[in-house]
Amino acid sequence: MALFLLTCLLAVFSAATAQSSLLGPSSIFGPGEVNVLEGDSVSITCYYPTTSVTRHSRKFWCREEESGRCVTLASTGYTSQEYSGRGKLTDFPDKGEFVVTVDQLTQNDSGSYKCGVGVNGRGLDFGVNVLVSQKPEPDDVVYKQYESYTVTITCPFTYATRQLKKSFYKVEDGELVLIIDSSSKEAKDPRYKGRITLQIQSTTAKEFTVTIKHLQLNDAGQYVCQSGSDPTAEEQNVDLRLLTPGLLYGNLGGSVTFECALDSEDANAVASLRQVRGGNVVIDSQGTIDPAFEGRILFTKAENGHFSVVIAGLRKEDTGNYLCGVQSNGQSGDGPTQLRQLFVNEEIDVSRSPPVLKGFPGGSVTIRCPYNPKRSDSHLQLYLWEGSQTRHLLVDSGEGLVQKDYTGRLALFEEPGNGTFSVVLNQLTAEDEGFYWCVSDDDESLTTSVKLQIVDGEPSPTIDKFTAVQGEPVEITCHFPCKYFSSEKYWCKWNDHGCEDLPTKLSSSGDLVKCNNNLVLTLTLDSVSEDDEGWYWCGAKDGHEFEEVAAVRVELTEPAKVAVEPAKVPVDPAKAAPAPAEEKAKARCPVPRRRQWYPLSRKLRTSCPEPRLLAEEVAVQSAEDPASGSRASVDASSASGQSGSAKVLISTLVPLGLVLAAGAMAVAIARARHRRNVDRVSIGSYRTDISMSDLENSREFGAIDNPSACPDARETALGGKDELATATESTVEIEEPKKAKRSSKEEADLAYSAFLLQSNTIAAEHQDGPKEA
């Protein structure tokens, strides 16, 4: 158990030592001087940085002894016996402050104290001097003034004592101590040397004045104005109280608010905030601004002398005393004033961006801002500073609001976990130069200010031009410089609440993001529709930190309706396309796949020409076999040829005669061969001569390879009458599919079967006589 307690003590000691070395003594701040009357109460506020260590560390209030030891009077969860029932310490970790309250003060409470964090004497503390003055009598004249300021005390006298010596005393331990008199212009007390004067305006005056400059804490107390000498001297008791200035504590880069409440009924009075050091005006109600505070200060005026001043982007040189005042003529010292003491903690810098950002025309900048991530209902905002009393809201995360002028140009992003939000502003122009304020509505201390400058340069990344046609795909290409090679690159679609990342793989919406090693990022939108219209951003980021961004707007265009005529390509006559009639014949009569046999006596009723024959071949066959007139091709222009001139007739008949002569010779040769291979066959009383070679081509005996392709081919004309007109158009030769080879015996059997079938049919017709179809 003892070992466990020792370990805990060592851990506490180590934590205290670590935070002391991390923050330093300057990070704790409180009032340097406290002046209070005997019997009154006092509340002393001490400030500390709001880090994860200090929030949960021990807070203490101790009194210094002559030995240098600091005795704890109150701390977190502890109150000493001396303070029992009249003193306590209250911590406010969210605000980074704790308050020590002490009641029923006595003069014994005067002394030196320390308020701090951690362990006593480890450096994380701040010294406070407390002075408890004797309570004045009811007829005492009370004067109040701030430390380091000047006070003028008026002492009246009567006509009876106008010629007597005038003196000014201080009451110390019940005794009167001479400070100055009218016999000498120098102070009698060395503590006031060079700081005090006594004046009588004229011999007829009924008062004299005592002026004390550069007031110190020990100047507070009771004084006596005396005209004459005892026991007939005229006296007046004076109570001088030093006011404790209002304390303001801020972190480097953060903000503070001066709340000034001065009673003034003059509506035309000039309200101002001045620095005590130098006396220069920081800002006033007439628009005057100290150049050192330009762009980071805002004045808000109320009524009856009440106003507030916000200073953002705190710097270490802002530390010091400030004076709120209301003057009728605009001059200091003319009206009521209030002193404020500002302390800037240099140990912690809350800003996330440098005080000055630079951007290029057409480029982008990212303003990073602090906020408290533990407060989920915070409204994160960005303002444009427009003067001493105006700032213009650009974006609000709580309302999802983006000003119309910044549509597609500005978006706010929260970075989870690290208390930072980023505002990206792109498509920069010279008009964007100025000061921008980051604001978290629930913690004004985190308000920061950034100055934006537009300088010459080229923006990056860049986006290629494109055209988005409704219903068609579009690719948008984004190019990055080499400095972003290791950065994460992305496409997103902008909206009022930010910019939604597009998926890295094909999604249901058809959006595709891909990137190659050449630092080119391509956004592909499939079948662009109205839902795809809007602003798209292409950018790079390192973790949660946004880098440069380029923006482009997708707008739909209607598909172009242009009549395009096909180009005229010269055609080789030898390779000319078939005539329309030939194409129709091809469509009606595809390549035959199987054969079907019909009786030889029936003429086929079909409009399908022989697919294997060209137009020239049809003409030749007609010459070879005049009897087969149904398969001959008739020239459509023969009628007009007969009515032509004799020259045309001769030029036509001569070639025809040559063709007929050649045909007659071919027929003679064919018949000579036919006689050698003719066999006489008798079926009943019917006799005929047939040659086996005549049956080699089954089509000459009425066979159809694929009757299903030509339904009309199944109908025949009886009695030698053809009911269908023979096609007169020239046909294009269609290559027949290769036929399976048969043996001679198979071909003979097949031909003989066809012959028997045809013979039976002819015999039946001969017995029954001809019939009309």
Curated annotation (Swiss-Prot):
Q: Where is this region: Disordered?
A: 619-641, 725-746
Which residue intervals are topologically Cytoplasmic?
671-773
Q: Which GO terms describe its cellular component?
A: plasma membrane; secretory IgA immunoglobulin complex
Keyword field? Cell membrane, Disulfide bond, Glycoprotein, Immunoglobulin domain, Membrane, Phosphoprotein, Repeat, Secreted, Signal, Transmembrane, Transmembrane helix
What PANTHER family is this protein classified in? POLYMERIC IMMUNOGLOBULIN RECEPTOR (PTHR11860:SF82), POLYMERIC-IMMUNOGLOBULIN RECEPTOR (PTHR11860)
The disulfide bridges present are C46-C115, C155-C225, C260-C324, C369-C438, C478-C538
Which residues does the entry place in the Extracellular compartment? 19-647
Q: Where is the Ig-like V-type domain?
A: 25-131, 138-232, 233-340, 352-455, 461-557
Q: How is it modified after translation?
A: N-glycosylated. N-glycosylation is required for anchoring IgA molecules to mucus, but is not necessary for Ig binding.
The name this protein goes by in its record: Polymeric immunoglobulin receptor
Residues bearing Phosphoserine are S682, S691, S698, S744
Q: What gene does this protein come from?
A: PIGR
- Which GO biological process categories is it annotated with? immunoglobulin transcytosis in epithelial cells mediated by polymeric immunoglobulin receptor
Can you tell me where the transmembrane regions are?
648-670
- PROSITE patterns linked: IG_LIKE (PS50835)
- Which GO-annotated molecular functions does the record name? transmembrane signaling receptor activity
- State how it assembles: Interacts (mainly via CDR1-like domain) with dimeric IgA. Interacts (mainly via CDR2-like domain) with pentameric IgM.
Basic and acidic residues bias located where?
A: 735-746
Sequence ranges of Low complexity compositional bias: 632-641
The region annotated as signal peptide is 1-18
Q: Which residues are glycosylated?
A: K88, N108, N418
- State a single Pfam family of this protein: V-set
Entry's free-text remark on domains: The Ig-like V-type 1/D1 domain contains three complementarity determining region-like loops CDR1-3, which mediate interaction with IgA and IgM.
